[in-house]
Design a protein with these regions (language model features):
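N-terminal Rossmann-like FAD-binding beta1-loop-alpha1 element of flavoenzymes
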Residues: 7-39
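Membrane-embedded alpha-helical bundles of multi-pass transporters/translocases
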Residues: 20, 31, 37, 78-94, ...
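N-terminal FAD cofactor-binding segment of flavoenzymes
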Residues: 27, 47-96
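Short beta-strand to alpha-helix junction loop
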Residues: 61-62, 108-127, 181, 258-259
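Helix-loop-beta segment of a Rossmann-like dinucleotide-binding subdomain
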Residues: 99-118, 250-252
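FAD/FMN-dependent oxidoreductases across multiple families
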Residues: 115, 243, 255-360, 364-367
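Predominantly flavin-linked oxidoreductase catalytic cores and closely associated redox partners
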Residues: 131-267, 271
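C-terminal helical "tail/cap" subdomain of flavin- and related membrane-associated enzymes
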Residues: 341-448
């Protein structure tokens, strides 16, 4: 991995102060004289929800890969998470994992999950980034357009505190979420249409924050209930700060968890595994239950865009928005930021400066995007109502996924590898070609 940093004179402008934008600030600070982060929200001084993160009060998971990427960018950030009150969960010794009719063995795979709410993760990262001497975060600045001249992005503009503003820069990073605004800006600026891949998934989920019943105080067990097709319901329970739980119940299409407590509890009881219902029964709801709908997942293929402007880097959900059930968004964004840091170092070495930063960035960023996208898409495409192109070898991939699942239940080392792939620590190829491939292949026969 490239880690050398050579200072590049100039100014970097980042749109979005969520996990992706903050990670990008950490990645770029060593290369620029000034890094400016713009966000439309007023950012809270504590670990509080903010309006601009529409699903910020839903359950968010920082995968172990995301935790690792952030530690690379901000050494010591894990201690920051601990100071924010993170619950330490041993994967998978502290996990009750029900999937497709089977409960996985509770094995210690050698990894610790630091469980927090999304606002607490973001607050811990933001406080670190604020202390960087050449990084400034401007709140209440809503970007509504980008200016492109001679094939290069030269500025962004919008409204801040009811006044128009323009920000010039030498490099622009868009990390402003899953709404596709960057693609719209580029089309309006005359750069063309961004090719996209879209899956219509119609995922619904309801999340509540709960104080634990007395018998569960201090218990950091997490619960995962993925029944799989044909069942459309699922449940997740994760411990967070203040000895509380975030509990999310979800479904597809018309299958949705109610937003009243009795209905929510009954929905939990309807799951084919009772660990979540048992915990909800005596827990105390803190605040309202909130329901959300995610109609689709989208991948914007900026790398295939003939008119893609120089000096522009899309990052995180600006490249791909995933089914949130799989908890990949924050971690992919952090991985993109690591790819950006390495791309800046390579651009400096190339002698071409920032003009070829994107061509160094895209290969690694898109490799990570593809792994996350394919994991989520395979789960989505198993449901016949999901609209989107299925790969020609779809049935073969499903058979391999089932073989990996069975082998993981049987073998500790395969269980660990499956975890590492899901958490973006190892590539999928490690299951097909690595030293454990024979154990997985041995499980293929029953699928044929």
């Amino acid at each position: 991995m490239v880690t050398r940093t050579t200072k590049t004179a100039g100014r970097c402008v980042i749109v979005g102060a969520g996990i992706g934008g903050l990670a990008a600030a950490a990645a770029t600070a060593a290369f620029f004289d000034e890094v400016v982060v713009l966000d439309r929200d007023e950012l809270p001084e504590t670990a509080q929800h903010r309006r601009g993160v529409a699903q910020g009060q839903q359950l968010h998971i920082l995968l172990k890969g995301g935790d690792t990427f952030l530690e690379l960018l901000l050494p010591g950030i894990r201690e920051g998470f601990n100071r924010a009150g993170a619950c330490q969960v041993r994967h998978e010794a502290d996990s009750i994992h029900f999937e497709r009719g089977h409960v996985f063995p509770q094995r210690d795979l050698g990894y610790i999950h630091l469980g927090l709410s999304r606002p607490a993760y973001e607050w811990a990262v933001r406080e670190r980034v604020r202390r960087m001497p050449n990084v400034v975060i401007h709140e209440r600045r809503s970007v509504d357009h980008a200016n492109v001249e001679a094939g290069r992005l030269i500025s962004v503009g919008g409204t801040g505190d009811q006044q128009p503003f323009t920000e010039d820069g030498d490099l622009f990073i868009f990390a402003n979420g899953r709404n596709g605004t960057l693609a719209q800006f580029l089309t309006k600026a005359g750069s063309g249409v961004v090719p996209t891949t879209e899956l219509t998934i119609e995922v619904n989920y309801t999340t509540g924050r709960f104080k634990k019943a007395e018998r569960y105080k201090g218990d950091n067990t997490q619960v995962v209930c993925f029944p799989g097709p044909p069942h459309r319901a699922l449940g997740l329970l994760f411990p967070i700060e203040n000895d509380e739980w975030l509990i999310a119940l979800g479904g597809r299409g018309n299958e949705r968890a109610p937003t009243d407590l009795d209905g929510f509890s009954n929905y939990a009881a309807s799951l084919p595994f009772g660990a979540i219902a048992d915990r909800v029964r005596d827990a105390q709801l803190v605040g309202p239950l909130r329901g959300f709908r995610v109609p689709s997942s989208t991948w914007w293929h900026y790398d295939r865009m003939p008119g893609f402007p120089r000096r522009l880097i899309p990052l995180g959900d600006s490249i791909a928005s995933f089914n949130p059930t799989f908890g990949q968004g924050m971690s992919v964004a952090a991985g993109h930021a690591v790819a950006l840091r390495n791309a800046l170092a390579m651009s400096s070495d190339s002698g071409r400066g920032l003009d070829n930063c994107a061509e160094h960035y895209f290969p690694k960023a898109l490799e990570l995007t593809a792994q996350a996208w394919n994991t989520a898409a395979m789960g989505d495409l198993e449901f016949p109502e999901t609209q989107g192109r299925r790969p020609e070898d779809f049935e073969k991939r499903l058979a391999f996924s089932e073989a990996l699942r069975r082998a993981a239940r049987k073998h500790h080392e395969v269980h660990k590898l499956r975890f590492e792939i899901a958490h973006l620590l190892s590539p999928v190829s490690a299951a097909r070609d690595g030293p454990l491939a024979a154990l997985i292949s041995a499980e293929l026969q029953p699928s044929l």
